[in-house]
Amino acid sequence: MKTLLLTLVVVTIVCLDLGYTLTCLNCPEMFCGKFQTCRDGEKICFKKLQQRRPFSLRYIRGCAATCPGTKPRDMVECCSTDRCNR
């Protein structure tokens, strides 16, 4: 009986989806050191560079469910591994 119980526990642990959470940089600066753990469904890290006016750039980094869209003069890079949006 103990063997059966132990076997069931081992099978449950092996089959259990422990859930992987992605970690992405999340800050508006060019050089960033703040990280966030992405929520369920967010499997993409992104880095967006917006050109507001000549010589004025804005950086946006974070997690997303899909790669964000762009406007003219924007640049977006998307990736799917931890801290890949440097």
Swiss-Prot record:
Q: Does the keyword Secreted apply?
A: yes
Query: For this UniProt entry, which residues form the secretion signal?
Result: 1-21
Q: Which SUPFAM superfamilies match?
A: Snake toxin-like
Q: In which compartments does the protein localize?
A: Secreted
Major subcellular site: secreted
Q: Which UniProt keywords apply?
A: Acetylcholine receptor inhibiting toxin, Disulfide bond, Ion channel impairing toxin, Neurotoxin, Postsynaptic neurotoxin, Secreted, Signal, Toxin
Disulfide-bond pairs as recorded: C24-C45, C27-C32, C38-C63, C67-C78, C79-C84
Any one Pfam family match given in the protein's UniProt record, by short name: Toxin_cobra-type
How would you summarize where this protein is expressed among tissues? Answer: Expressed by the venom gland.
A GO CC term assigned to this protein in UniProt = extracellular region
Name a GO molecular-function annotation: acetylcholine receptor inhibitor activity
Q: Report the InterPro entries cross-referenced here.
A: Snake_3FTx, Snake_toxin-like_sf, Snake_toxin_con_site, Toxin_cobra-type
What does the UniProt function comment say about this protein? Binds with low affinity to muscular (alpha-1-beta-1-delta-epsilon/CHRNA1-CHRNB1-CHRND-CHRNE) and very low affinity to neuronal (alpha-7/CHRNA7) nicotinic acetylcholine receptor (nAChR).
The UniProt similarity line reads: Belongs to the three-finger toxin family. Ancestral subfamily. Orphan group II sub-subfamily.
| Protein name as it appears in the record | Weak neurotoxin 6
- State the organism named in the record: Naja sputatrix (Malayan spitting cobra)
